[in-house]
Regions:
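Conserved structural core of kinase catalytic domains
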Residues: 47-91
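A short, flexible beta-alpha/helix-coil linker loop
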Residues: 16-19, 118
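Conserved catalytic motifs of the protein kinase core domain
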Residues: 5, 54, 129-132
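Conserved kinase catalytic-core segment
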Residues: 83-148
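Single conserved hydrophobic/aromatic residue that forms the stacking wall/gate
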Residues: 1-10, 47
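C-terminal catalytic region of ATP-dependent kinase domains
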Residues: 126-212
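A conserved alpha-helical element in kinase catalytic cores
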Residues: 19-45
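Active-site ExK catalytic segment of metal-dependent nucleases
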Residues: 11-17, 60
Length: 212
């Protein structure tokens, strides 16, 4: 492998298999990445590829020999998302703002899988110091990933059946963390449309339903 290839994506993920609506996670990862980028978040960029006949999402690593990812669940062990917010606030405004932005983003895309291993911080492997919030990553279980054709016309009702890992509604999370930065990030979504992949896409009716 070339040096560039070694630096490039070493994180390929396929989707689930089985039911007619299975296997959609890589697609939703790709589309959710577009939302994060439009909002201007510190987020991992995802693309799609066909790998040995399997549709997979791919991205570049955000860690290296000098930098480690530490999941928040290894640091804040009790108290849920409220305790995580308080811990981030102690690290400073930028840490706190990025966490709040991630939570608003998750609510916007109905991310159902932002558990305490799916966000965290970056640590300098030499000094042991926390140096930055980790970028937003792993957003595949979102955008009504498992919605069926019968749900597309009634997404408002379907949305009520979706939940995050915190036992708090998406609306309650947003009410707690929404600030000026997050409002500006949401304004950037006005008129947003998903960029279709040249060959790998969710059904068009799914995309049109979630674009409304």
């Amino acid at each position: 492998l070339s040096r560039r290839q070694r630096q490039m994506c070493i994180r390929d993920r396929g989707g689930t298999t089985g039911a007619s609506n299975a296997g959609r996670e890589p697609y939703c990862e790709y589309y959710a990445s577009q939302v994060a980028e439009t909002m201007g978040l510190n987020a991992v960029h995802y693309d799609l590829e066909n790998w040995k006949g399997i549709t997979a999402s791919k991205c570049e690593l955000f860690t290296n020999i000098d930098t480690a990812y530490i999941p928040i669940g290894r640091i804040v062990r009790t108290g849920g998302i409220a305790a995580c917010l308080a811990w981030y606030e102690k690290l400073g405004t930028e840490f706190s703002e990025q966490l709040c932005s991630m939570l608003v983003f998750d609510a916007l895309i109905y991310n159902e899988d932002r558990h305490f291993g799916n966000f965290g911080v970056l640590r300098d492997n030499h000094s042991g110091k926390i140096i930055a919030p980790a970028p937003v990553f792993d957003n595949g279980l979102s955008l009504f990933c498992y919605a069926g054709k019968e749900d597309y016309a009634h997404l408002d009702e379907y949305a009520k059946t979706r939940s995050n890992p915190y036992n708090i509604s998406y609306e309650e999370v947003c009410a707690e963390v929404m600030g000026a930065r997050q409002k500006e990030q949401l304004r950037r979504m006005i008129g947003f449309r998903f960029k279709r992949h040249e060959s790998l896409n969710l059904p068009e009716e799914h995309l049109q339903a979630i674009e409304k």
